[in-house]
A protein has these predicted regions:
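Extended amphipathic alpha-helical segments with heptad-repeat/coiled-coil character used for oligomerization
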Residues: 251-304
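N-terminal secretory signal peptides
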Residues: 1-14, 39-41
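Acidic/His metal-coordination segments adjacent to aromatic residues that form catalytic metal sites
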Residues: 188-214
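Inter-helical turn/loop segments and adjacent helix faces that build the functional surface
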Residues: 230-247
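N-terminal export signals
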Residues: 17-40
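Second-shell loop/turn segments in exported
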Residues: 111-112, 209-217, 238-241
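Carbohydrate-associated surface elements
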Residues: 43-194
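Mobile, glycine-rich extracellular loop/lid and propeptide segments
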Residues: 213, 218-230, 234, 253-254
Length: 304
C-alpha cells in the first residue's frame, strides 16, 4: 500500500485526505454485519404511517401519490405496449445472429451501441456493488409485497459485508488464522487464487451471488487477497496489537480503498465527474433520510 499522496482528476481531493475523512463512517466495521438497526416513521400520501428501518427496503418519496390508483386494464395495456416487439424498449437487434455475435460484433448492434467510456469490467463491478447493499431473500415473483415489509439482508452501506459476513466470530467459516493474523480463506495451487470451496465445488461465501460467474468470483477473490495483504501490512506496523485489532484495522483499510474506487473510478462513469465533485463539495441536497435504507426505486429500477 502506497503512502504517498495521490491527486485525483477532480483536482480537489487527495487520497490521504479522502481516506482519513472516511473514518467516521467506518468505525463499526470490525464486528457485526448489521449496523445497530435504527427506526423512524414514514408517512404515505394517503396519511398512512409505516416504519423505516435499516434492514428493510423503503420508498424514496413515500409522500407522493401513486402513479396509478389501481391495477386495471388501461395500465396493463400501457405496460404491454411499452414492452412489445418494436416498442420503445426494443433495441431492434438482429436476434437471429445469436447472443455471442451480438456482444462481439458492434456492427450487429447499431441501435444499441457499446458505451465508449465503460470497459466490460464496469458491469461486473456494478454487480459487486449491488451485492454489497441489497439482498432480498423473501420476495417472490408475482406476489406483491410492500417494500417496507421486505427484509434487506445486506446493510445499506458500502461496508463489504458481502465479503466479511458477520466477521470472524459470526462467520468463522470464512476465516483462517496465521498466528495472530485473521485472514479470509483462499484456495491456492491452481493458476490463480480461488474462493474457498466445499467438496461439491460450491463456494464458501457471505453472499452466494458472488460466485455467479467467473468475473464476479474474481472480484470477490481480489478483495480477499487485498484484505490479507492489509493484515500483513498492519501486523508489521503494529507488532504489539492483538489479532482483533489487526483484523479491524485491515478491514478499515480495505473498506477505505473500496470507497476510493467507488468515488473516483466508478461514479464518474455513470453520473459524470462534475456531479461527483458537486456532491463532495456541497453535500447532498435532496435525498437525506434520517434512517439509512435502500429505496425500492433505486434497487429495482434506477440502479438497473
Amino acid at each position: 500500500m502506497k503512502t504517498n499522496q495521490h491527486r485525483s482528476h477532480s483536482g480537489g481531493f487527495d487520497r490521504r485526505r479522502f481516506l482519513g475523512a472516511c473514518g467516521a463512517g467506518a468505525l463499526a466495521l470490525g464486528g457485526s454485519s448489521f449496523l445497530g438497526v435504527s427506526e423512524a416513521f414514514g408517512q404515505t400520501a394517503s396519511g398512512g404511517r409505516f416504519f423505516l428501518r435499516e434492514d428493510r427496503f423503503g420508498r424514496m418519496f413515500p409522500g407522493l401519490p401513486a402513479f396509478f390508483s389501481r391495477t386495471g386494464r388501461r395500465l396493463t395495456e400501457a405496460l404491454v405496449d411499452i414492452g412489445k416487439p418494436g416498442g420503445i424498449l426494443d433495441a431492434k437487434d438482429n436476434l437471429a445472429a445469436g447472443p455471442v455475435a451480438l456482444v462481439a460484433d458492434p456492427a450487429l448492434s447499431l441501435n444499441n451501441p457499446n458505451n465508449a467510456t465503460h470497459t466490460a469490467g464496469t458491469t461486473f463491478m456494478g454487480q459487486f456493488l449491488d451485492h454489497d447493499v441489497t439482498f432480498d431473500l423473501g420476495s417472490r415473483l408475482n406476489v406483491p409485497v410492500d417494500p417496507e415489509d421486505s427484509l434487506n439482508t445486506r446493510t445499506p452501506a458500502f461496508d463489504l459485508d458481502s465479503v466479511y459476513g458477520g466477521g470472524p466470530r459470526r462467520s468463522p467459516e470464512l476465516y483462517g488464522y496465521q498466528g495472530s493474523r485473521i485472514k479470509l480463506k483462499l484456495e491456492n495451487g491452481g493458476l490463480f487464487e480461488d474462493l474457498p470451496r466445499r467438496s461439491n465445488r460450491s463456494a464458501i461465501l457471505a453472499d452466494p451471488r458472488n460466485d455467479e460467474n467467473i468475473m464476479i468470483a474474481g472480484l470477490q477473490t481480489a478483495f480477499y487477497s487485498f484484505h490479507n495483504k492489509a493484515v500483513d501490512y498492519v501486523a508489521r506496523r503494529h507488532s504489539r496489537w492483538d489479532s482483533d485489532d489487526i483484523f479491524k484495522e485491515a478491514r478499515r483499510l480495505t473498506t477505505w480503498h473500496y470507497h476510493w474506487m467507488i468515488i473516483h473510478e466508478f461514479l464518474p462513469l455513470f453520473i459524470g465527474q462534475n456531479l461527483v465533485d458537486d456532491i463532495l463539495h456541497r453535500g447532498r441536497r435532496f435525498y437525506r433520510p434520517r434512517v439509512g435504507f435502500i429505496p425500492v426505486e433505486f434497487q429495482g429500477a434506477a440502479y438497473r
